[in-house]
Amino acid sequence: RMDQLLVTLSEQAIQRAAPQPGERVLDIGCGCGSTSLTMAGQGARVTGVDISEPMLANARARSAGNEMLEFILADASSHPFDTRFDLAFSRFGVMFFADPHQAFAHIRSAIQDQGRLCFICWQSPKDNPWLSVPGGAAQPFLPEPEAQPDPRAPGPFAFADPAYVQEILDQAGFTSIAIEPCSADMRLGSDVEEAVAFLLRNGPMSRVLAEVDEDLRNKALDAVRETLAPLATAEGIMLSGACWIASANQG
């Protein structure tokens, strides 16, 4: 379901990364393997890494018999790769490192001298209506956070500030760094109930709703339904998502 939501953004990121036939590609945080399969389909030899064994089992099942792909249970920030890659790529997989400066220095060491890096990450929640619109509707019924979270703490939006991303990559030794905006319409579901079910499983609102009592949860969800109902189209519930695509050379 998440792969379906991200299909347009994935296409934009892979187009920017431009994997070539015969290139060795490292897919960081590959999850269930969708981006790895796409790049292998373009002729690249792909090594997908993730820290989730269930997701990797799914990826291996989807790619059974495909000799262009391998999947490793590993943390890309520290794994001793036995090859150097032409391209290190990630779709929403690099914002969770405890020490991003160290992580990107290590990733750079796994890239060939003439190689490159390309990843896509989220802009801030307020710039992502697919989250901020339902989140804003639910907010009056949810508890205030005890403290303002560190916007750069590991998590989906840790790289929302492009200046921070630039500084991390620069310090890691990358060159020709470019950070470009991209956006796409996100299909949350075919109708309101499917969209609500999706939001209950994904995103920051799902975690908060899991912790409140049933009465508040129901009020919050009713408010979300009321907000999403006028947005229904023939294509489903569509709201925009905003990201950065970062690219850089190894040296």
Predicted regions and their residues:
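Helix-to-beta-strand junctions that scaffold the AdoMet/dcAdoMet cofactor pocket
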Residues: 97-98, 111-113
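Core SAM-dependent methyltransferase catalytic element
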Residues: 175, 243-251
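Conserved catalytic/acceptor-binding region of the Class I
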Residues: 101, 116-189, 206
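Conserved alpha-helix/loop element of class I SAM-dependent methyltransferases that forms part
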Residues: 3-23, 38
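Class I SAM-dependent methyltransferase SAM/SAH-binding core
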Residues: 24-79, 102
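C-terminal helical/coil "lid" or tail adjacent to the Rossmann-like core of SAM-dependent
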Residues: 1, 176-234
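A short SAM/SAH-binding and catalytic strip from SAM-dependent methyltransferases
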Residues: 86-101, 123
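A short acidic, Gly/Pro-enriched loop at the edge of an enzyme's catalytic core
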Residues: 77-87
